[in-house]
Amino acid sequence: MKVGVIAYQGSFEEHAIQLKRAMSKLNLTGEVIAVKKPKDVDLIDGVVIPGGESTTIGIIAEKLGVLDEIKAKINAGLPVLGTCAGAIMLAKDVSDAKVGKKSQPLIGTMDIQVVRNYYGRQRESFETDLDFRVIGGGKARVVFIRAPIIKRTWNDATALISFENGIVMAEQKNMLATTFHPELSESTIVHEYFLSKIKK
């Protein structure tokens, strides 16, 4: 199993560590690959789009030709986990809590509406416990950093976990989106669940 993590900016190392921990817990043999060029996408069985600045990630990925390559692979069934900025990249509908609709390069494969910077400056970063029973876990502490929120889902996209009147984890076929940072959690449940989607 080869899992790619888009590695232009954001928490590549943290995701790599969590993926390796999750592989170990699930007794899976695999490696984590930094995805920077279109050819890297051909090597992987699943991809993580990490947190960071979604506009920057999108612009770099578009310029290097990775954006279209990943979009085509996701549409063909490649499992993907988008976290925070990665969830924004996956969304078909994106707006900003302050400035409304925002134009930026997106992958745009998931039937979710995401609002950037949802929690505002008062709560730029915070931690809370979420219940992961729906994906086979228990309660786990998670970190939100200038987090977006998933306002709604449609078609066969479904809300998995909600918090404070918004969706913080959603799923649609081979796509998984979280508005928190599972790579900064002690728990590996989100990465384990993602790896189980690759294994199928």
From Swiss-Prot:
Reaction catalysis annotation: aldehydo-D-ribose 5-phosphate + D-glyceraldehyde 3-phosphate + L-glutamine = pyridoxal 5'-phosphate + L-glutamate + phosphate + 3 H2O + H(+); L-glutamine + H2O = L-glutamate + NH4(+)
Family from the record: Belongs to the glutaminase PdxT/SNO family.
Disulfide-bonded cysteines: none
Regions crossing the membrane: none
CDD domains: GATase1_PB
Residues annotated to bind L-glutamine: 52-54, 116, 145-146
Name used for this protein in its record: Pyridoxal 5'-phosphate synthase subunit PdxT
Record-listed E.C. numbers: 4.3.3.6, 3.5.1.2
Biological role stated in the UniProt entry: Catalyzes the hydrolysis of glutamine to glutamate and ammonia as part of the biosynthesis of pyridoxal 5'-phosphate. The resulting ammonia molecule is channeled to the active site of PdxS.
Pfam families listed in its UniProt record: SNO
GO MF, one example: pyridoxal 5'-phosphate synthase (glutamine hydrolysing) activity
Subunit record text: In the presence of PdxS, forms a dodecamer of heterodimers. Only shows activity in the heterodimer.
GO biological process assignments: glutamine catabolic process; pyridoxal phosphate biosynthetic process; pyridoxine metabolic process
Residue positions of the active site: 84 (nucleophile), 181 (charge relay system), 183 (charge relay system)
InterPro entries xref list: Class_I_gatase-like (IPR029062), PdxT/SNO (IPR002161), PdxT/SNO_CS (IPR021196)
Pathway membership, UniProt: Cofactor biosynthesis; pyridoxal 5'-phosphate biosynthesis
GO cellular component: cytosol; glutaminase complex
UniProt-listed HAMAP family: PdxT
Keywords associated with the record: Glutamine amidotransferase, Hydrolase, Lyase, Pyridoxal phosphate
